[in-house]
Amino acid sequence: MKIINLGILAHVDAGKTTLTESLLYTSGAIAEPGSVDKGTTRTDTINLERQRGITIQTAVTSFQWEDVKVNIIDTPGHMDFLAEVYRSLSVLDGAVLLVSAKDGIQAQTRILFHALQIMKIPTIFFINKIDQEGIDLPMVYQEMKAKLSSEIIVKQKVGQHPHINVTDNDDMEQWDAVIMGNDELLEKYMSGKPFKMSELEQEENRRFQNGTLFPVYHGSAKNNLGIRQLIEVIASKFYSSTPEGQSELCGQVFKIEYSEKRRRFVYVRIYSGTLHLRDVIRISEKEKIKITEMCVPTNGELYSSDTACSGDIVILPNDVLQLNSILGNEILLPQRKFIENPLPMLQTTIAVKKSEQREILLGALTEISDGDPLLKYYVDTTTHEIILSFLGNVQMEVICAILEEKYHVEAEIKEPTVIYMERPLRKAEYTIHIEVPPNPFWASVGLSIEPLLLGSGVQYESRVSLGYLNQSFQNAVMEGVLYGCEQGLYGWKVTDCKICFEYGLYYSPVSTPADFRLLSPIVLEQALKKAGTELLEPYLHFEIYAPQEYLSRAYHDAPRYCADIVSTQIKNDEVILKGEIPARCIQEYRNDLTNFTNGQGVCLTELKGYQPAIGKFICQPRRPNSRIDKVRHMFHKLA
């Protein structure tokens, strides 16, 4: 049996979850399609997903069409959940990208299509909601060519009489994109030689599989119009990326979730081989796991199974496997271009309304962050506040909703702030000597620190001979230095610098690695005080797409948001502005752009890196360490 792992992607409200329900219903996997409006869909399982009609977590379901099994991966549609989408793309054999016939190409559509192109995933466009009033399909095609790709091939005609219908497109002009992309076919066309249809179809299929040509289909997911034709295309056009003739097991974890009873489940894509119940599988050089239970998606449900075949998705209860963990032979994993996840740029304080729920909150955050590595938290041991880093406001709203719905915890959050970093201003050295008050540790440590270029990160070097100071002491110094880099003079992480271990002394037999580990961050802090630090803030590359008449307004508003426009381009009556902007300003800039362009403006961003901060210095409380803070304060008094 052929198995296809299909991603369904779209901007918010394009009808993605409704399409999933319609595919399940039309294929016979379910007796009645669920409704987003009624909250009865199979893939939106969180109440907030049902209430708001948006997908928040990647969901997996499946249907069968003749001898083809299709696993559907229903992905989120909001920008705050891009990390969830990117993880899902790695397991796909193909994708259906929805375009709303009513709303056209949205910002998220462009972002998702860009990711699909980078990973060269074969993609079908499905224009949804064609039965709504006022639809102009030629205008939609034109917008797709201008904003997504000119390499589209419209495979269907949409008729209106006696009622709206979808039929195959037999016009020769539909093949223009195929002919223009192939020199031999173009030469035949220019010389008036006849084509064989098999030649055109073969070239279409080759370019589709390479992710460079995009067939366009039509329908209405809500009314099951055009869905049968879409299923037939999915079953015939997409191929499994599983290597042929390979019996050795290879699988990868792409999703982690917890059940209501707090059981931990991992979702694994099997790339080759077969997984059996009671198999013992190697997951690292030193570690193996035994498969004691597993489920596979089958016809809209999850069923227990004794085997999971190559190409399929399997769900395992497991407390060891992490996101991206490999089961079996890593060499057999397909090579795809890596898409760097966006970094959390915001942080806030989260607290419970009822003090007795604090431990429940901490456990819940541990579980949630386990499935989403971009969500991180720590506890300030002085104030006991819980500090949470995240991507955007919608993500924060979702976290609060999950806490209330799944863990029965009422949480409240403070106004978020941008996550800053620090870099030393100049080179400096500092040494703390053994038996010289107020040093209580049996160790001497001397460090130097100097700034590096932005984006260099932290570089560490030991200039102390191993013959003079053994490896365990040297390792302890490095660990202490890296710990000290977590908090600079203003409480932010230290980066873009070189730190050298210049001098060390120990007394045998009283000195221990702990002495060096605890003293090193104190020495580093004193060196930073001599060097001084500058505050760095995250900057974003941005691309603005807007109708040409809004060019002057976009330029005029840029300085208000500290944005620097570096290039301007006019294309298809649309202006494209590229530049840089502080991350703290982007949300207001986006909102302003949406307002003055009446929703026609699109702003795409990606992290550029950290740059010197503009404006006043923003401090955050230091995270204390009871073992070294007393000594820190003693040195602070001496300064």
Curated annotation (Swiss-Prot):
Residue positions binding GTP: 10-17, 74-78, 128-131
PROSITE patterns: G_TR_1, G_TR_2
Gene Ontology terms: biological process: response to antibiotic; ribosome disassembly; translation
Record domain tr-type G: where: 1-244
Keyword hit for GTP-binding: yes
Annotated Gene3D superfamilies: 3.30.230.10, 3.30.70.240, Elongation Factor G (Translational Gtpase), domain 3 (3.30.70.870), P-loop containing nucleotide triphosphate hydrolases (3.40.50.300), Translation factors (2.40.30.10)
GO molecular function, one term: GTP binding
Keywords: Antibiotic resistance, GTP-binding, Nucleotide-binding, Protein biosynthesis
CDD domains: Tet_C, Tet_II, Tet_III, Tet_like_IV, TetM_like
InterPro entries linked: EF-G-like_DII (IPR053905), EFG_II (IPR041095), EFG_III/V (IPR035647), EFG_V-like (IPR000640), G_TR_CS (IPR031157), P-loop_NTPase (IPR027417), Ribosomal_Su5_D2-typ_SF (IPR020568), Ribsml_uS5_D2-typ_fold_subgr (IPR014721)
Family indicated by similarity: Belongs to the TRAFAC class translation factor GTPase superfamily. Classic translation factor GTPase family. TetM/TetO subfamily.
Function: Abolishes the inhibitory effect of tetracyclin on protein synthesis by a non-covalent modification of the ribosomes.
Annotated protein name in UniProt: Tetracycline resistance protein TetO
